[in-house]
Amino acid sequence: MAAAAVSRTLLPVAGRRLWGFTRRLPLRAAAAQPLYFGGDRLRSTQAAPQVVLNVPETQVTCLENGLRVASENSGISTCTVGLWIDAGSRYENEKNNGTAHFLEHMAFKGTKKRSQLDLELEIENMGAHLNAYTSREQTVYYAKAFSKDLPRAVEILADIIQNSTLGEAEIERERGVILREMQEVETNLQEVVFDYLHATAYQNTALGRTILGPTENIKSISRKDLVDYITTHYKGPRIVLAAAGGVCHNELLELAKFHFGDSLCAHKGDVPALPPCKFTGSEIRVRDDKMPLAHLAVAIEAVGWTHPDTICLMVANTLIGNWDRSFGGGMNLSSKLAQLTCHGNLCHSFQSFNTSYTDTGLWGLYMVCEQATVADMLHAVQKEWMRLCTAVSESEVARAKNLLKTNMLLQLDGSTPICEDIGRQMLCYNRRIPIPELEARIDAVDAEMVREVCTKYIYGKSPAIAALGPIERLPDFNQICSNMRWTRD
């Protein structure tokens, strides 16, 4: 890991420059000859290959029960602290699908120490924020607070995941809340299309199920289901206590030992295995000619977090880029697909994505088109994918690498995104990858590597397709698959 840097300031001596080039000072003497200082004398000040980086160190400690404590101290007056748990909808089956998300909702409904009102008042009085979310492979509970309130924030998080009452009345009341949330999700067409995409790409597997679960499960999940899920999955080796901002690692470590050291024991017997999820090239079409626009997602199988091809696929994803009609630039856009789309008025917007899981992933593109341009837009996408496999240039790759590094650094703006990055990376890699290492891995990608990796994962592969809306003109699946091997002019 990158060591914490010591900031050094070098004060210049009057009349001298600290760069290794010549300084020219004109004299007002009669000869008016220039006098030179410097030359090779300051060559020793040139930068060394290894530079001192002002990057806070991510400190990691593992407790005896397997729980990992990770933190980054930036010295500010606020902090974010949270619990990242290796448990999501992928660990569910058909009968209890939706339990992880239901449990997230129940976390703030009261504990053995605090009623729901007491919990809300305590958070409000601290000026803090308490939140949670569930994904297909992770469940997260986190709090944002003043640095001085770190002990209280950790105690509240520990109370939530270990002492929730899970009262029957609260469970029944929360069913209606989740059902209304499901109705809201169904109005978000992008969410709907991505659920369809997972359903067709990972048919009859855990990744093919939704995070919220089907309606019948939401109506039938019991307190026993929630308790069983906690007992099975909320174990020390599968939990990371992460913090960022103004936090002292030793203080956080002592808090973790006090609140979690004796309670979150390791698994007794076998650790629940992550169910394998096989990718299937296939499609889901939901035609509705009453809708004004067609929503379409097309993806190929990618790789998991730790696969060596992950970085190269991220660069390829950046090469495709994003676009919508509000963008300026026209034919001067860096993305070739954006240029084609803008020039031909092929769609309202498109967004490339690279979704990674533990052992698999989805790499593709989501687009919103008018009925008349669906086929042309899909053809343009596949043509651009084939170009990635055969003709991408070094200048394009260099530009994409710079953009990828910039976007990654801009996302780490504030204690909350940094804390999320720490927690996620600890679960995925069992370490926090230092930024210089990540930049070096991105810099190692070249055009030849992009062509090889894209050929490996894109060329000749059957994609997964989810389409919704007026999609009458969408080509049939066999034609789409054939265009993954060659393109017509």
Swiss-Prot record:
Database matches in Pfam families: Peptidase_M16 (PF00675), Peptidase_M16_C (PF05193)
Annotated positions binding Zn(2+): H101, H105, E181
Family statement: Belongs to the peptidase M16 family.
GO BP term, pick one: protein processing
Function: Catalytic subunit of the essential mitochondrial processing protease (MPP), which cleaves the mitochondrial sequence off newly imported precursors proteins. Preferentially, cleaves after an arginine at position P2. Required for PINK1 turnover by coupling PINK1 mitochondrial import and cleavage, which results in subsequent PINK1 proteolysis.
Catalytic reaction list: Release of N-terminal transit peptides from precursor proteins imported into the mitochondrion, typically with Arg in position P2
Source taxon at top rank: Eukaryota
Entry note: cofactor: Binds 1 zinc ion per subunit.
Protein name as it appears in the record: Mitochondrial-processing peptidase subunit beta
Coiled-coil residue spans: none
One term of GO molecular function: metal ion binding
Gene name tied to this protein: Pmpcb
Result after altering D195A: Severe loss of cleavage site specificity following an arginine at position P2. The loss is complete
Site (Required for the specific determination of the substrate cleavage site): E191, D195
Effect listed in the UniProt record for changing E191A: Loss of substrate cleavage site specificity. Complete loss of cleavage site specificity following an arginine at position P2
EC number: 3.4.24.64
Active site: E104
UniProt note on regulation of activity: Binding to PMPCA is required for catalytic activity.
Keywords: Hydrolase, Metal-binding, Metalloprotease, Mitochondrion, Protease, Transit peptide, Zinc
GO CC field: mitochondrial processing peptidase complex; mitochondrion
